[in-house]
Amino acid sequence: MLENINGEIGISDSSVKVIPWDGYGNDQIVRQLIHQEKPDAILHFTDPRYWTWLYRMEKEIRTKIPIIFYTIWDDLPYPMYNRDYYRSDDLLLCISKQTKNLVENVLKDYPKEDWQVQYVPHGIDDKVFYPVANDLEFEVFKEKFFEGKEYDFVVFWNNRNIRRKN
């Protein structure tokens, strides 16, 4: 998997891990992961009110690595109660143009640099992920993707709401 990710984005040293956890974590596990794994950043998504424990330690974290929030907010009124969370993030990745507009308005009194609030479309590249035409095409894809290795268990997550978000 790492070779595929590295090749796709043109780097040679990515590290991808999924660490199962019940709930949204806690300060001890984040400290442990920062110490052991030495990540380049923390990326989180979902309502920031689920992450109050993370934001309580944001100064401690941000002395070592940045906090990145992949955020969504679809509708008015402006979520002013999220302002302090947004201010505590080093980078806000907005799932839609509407989200970007809302975030920028919430931060009007505390504007961030242009690069710190970015529109990152929600979805997948339909030139890479598309319905396969036949079984042979699927077998060729599997051979190439898995590099000839056999796996007992493979997960593919597909989300279909891209058109609604952009």
Where are the language model's segments positioned?
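A short helix/loop element that forms part of the nucleotide-sugar donor recognition site in Leloir-type
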Residues: 130-148
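Short N-terminal targeting/anchoring amphipathic segment
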Residues: 19, 31-51, 66-68
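A conserved, positively charged/aromatic
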Residues: 62, 69, 79-94
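Short hydrophobic "strand-cap" motifs at the C-terminus of beta-strands
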Residues: 70, 95, 120, 157-159
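N-terminal strand-loop element at the rim of the active site
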Residues: 1-28, 32, 117
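An aromatic- and histidine-rich active-site surface loop
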Residues: 42-61, 76-84
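Carbohydrate-associated surface elements
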Residues: 98, 123
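Conserved donor-binding/catalytic core segment of Leloir-type glycosyltransferases
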Residues: 148-165
